[in-house]
Amino acid sequence: MKKVSVIIFIVIMLGIGCLNLNESIKETCPRTSNITQAMSCYIPEDFEILKGVAEEIPGGTIEWKIWNILEWEEDHLSYDNNKGSDIILKPSEFIKVGEGVCTDYAVLTAGLLLASNISPVYLMIFHFMEDPTLHAAVAVNISGKLFILDQRLPPKNLDSYLIQFSKLEGKIILFAEMYKVEMKKGRVVVSGRKYLDLSNFGFYPGNISLDMLENLLLSEFQRRTNLFPRIDLKTVLPQGLKERKVWMIKFENFKLFYDDTFVEQYSNFIADEILKNEKIKSDISRYSAFWISIKLEGDDLIVRLFLGR
């Protein structure tokens, strides 16, 4: 049994000066460090560019579109730890230079969502205990549940997002400002600021249906490899086969971030990660049967791939 990869989901944090809410909003659309002004001015100005990018990002459902937007940002953008200005980049500028901070990501992400006809979205501004630096991200509401989109996969429900900072980053979020951002007759309207007290927010893991995830993963793996599924490979070398091999893949902190809302996307993600391993790919070409089992060990997801021939 061999461990072949470790996947850690961590949101990159902002640098000092990432967010400025104190600049007054003017009637024109100047360069600005005020994120609400940037949302309302930059997005309409760059909307055709945003629409062109959004049309290239696949997504037959809202879940797939959101997932693929974050994946696109991972592939094309990176965090700028040395940005010397708090002026927010226009989406077209951010796409061109490929580096930005949390406010740049938030404006671009909101723009891509709105250009994908996902509206409203929500601007989230997080305030931390004992840290004056603020952090901006975007959220969407799916079936009454708020998911935070923050630069990288996966989308996280609010519980998961809070525990990420407290457990993995050592930072406590005290409260958040929440603004509605929506398209109205070609304009981007930012409205409805409200405050969410998160200081005593309890952590409740996202919905986890291991059976559903395992079944989707089995189907996806069979589709990609054309291997024959054999459930008895879990325990024995089945009759008619001469060799059995087991691979183990660990996804760290999976329980903290997983939610069944994105079960289809997670099953595809796990299959992708397994098949990125060249040794596993080589084995698959030499074996004829497979099975996959998954289980949680603490917060980690353990995936076992059984191969037979």
Swiss-Prot record:
Q: Which Gene3D superfamilies match?
A: 3.10.620.30
Domain of life according to the entry: Archaea
- Record SUPFAM superfamilies: Cysteine proteinases
Compartments where found: Cell membrane
Family as reported in the entry's similarity comment: Belongs to the UPF0252 family.
What do the Gene Ontology cellular component annotations say? plasma membrane
Give the stretches traversing the membrane: 5-25, 106-126
Organism from which the protein derives: Pyrococcus horikoshii (strain ATCC 700860 / DSM 12428 / JCM 9974 / NBRC 100139 / OT-3)
Q: Name one Pfam family in it.
A: DUF553
Q: Which InterPro entries match?
A: Papain-like_cys_pep_sf, Transglutaminase-like_domain
Q: How does it sit in the membrane?
A: Multi-pass membrane protein
Name listed for the protein in its UniProt record: UPF0252 protein PH0672
Q: Which UniProt keywords apply?
A: Cell membrane, Membrane, Transmembrane, Transmembrane helix
